[in-house]
Amino acid sequence: MEIGKVPENVLKRAVFKQIRHRREEVILHPGVGEDCSAVAVGEDEALVFSTDPITGTDKGIGNLAVHITANDLASSGAEPIGIMTTIILPDGTREIKLRRIMEEIETACSKLKIEVMGGHTEISDAVNRPIINVTGVGKVKKGKLVSTGGLKPGDEIVMTKWAGLEGTSIIAAEKEEKLLETLPRELVDVAKGFKEYLSVIPESKIAMEVGVSAMHDVTEGGVFGALWE
């Protein structure tokens, strides 16, 4: 298989066909484009869970990891509550690197009013750069839970912000020196600053108020990939 998202046909054959639904409390199940699952708690509330790794960059990795997972939760209609983090660092990583990653994570969580609830941290020769996986939890009324599969014929499709926003901010941070050889500093700084627009929580709240039928956080695959999912 090639680098990137596992193809849909492989997901269906190798992943989804192996999974069986056996708990009635689980009310949102695995599927193509479904980034969350949900568990019913009580009569009218559900806890929503999502998990995502950051593997493509180590610049601002803590900030990215928090926002990507929180966005998945928000796209299901949930209010993000907290996260658990798994941080795997390559052999020889200095303590200051770990501290900076955690500072990024805590800063992002503070802005979103969510909490770091725990996690796991280790040094491993299995990786050659930092890898973070974040599992997030949020809450939503069961009747307000939004699935990617809720899209209906005739629905209007609305995209917020800009295509390529996250990728542009990553490239600008990763390749800053190279870009400055041909582009003005002001332009590169604007591109790096796109990281401040990563959260979709404000938009999801507005969408919920007007009765949205489906939401999806666009990541790998771009706009067309997200619509296909």
What are these regions (language model features)?
Residues 1-229:
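Helix-biased detector of long, well-ordered alpha-helical tracts
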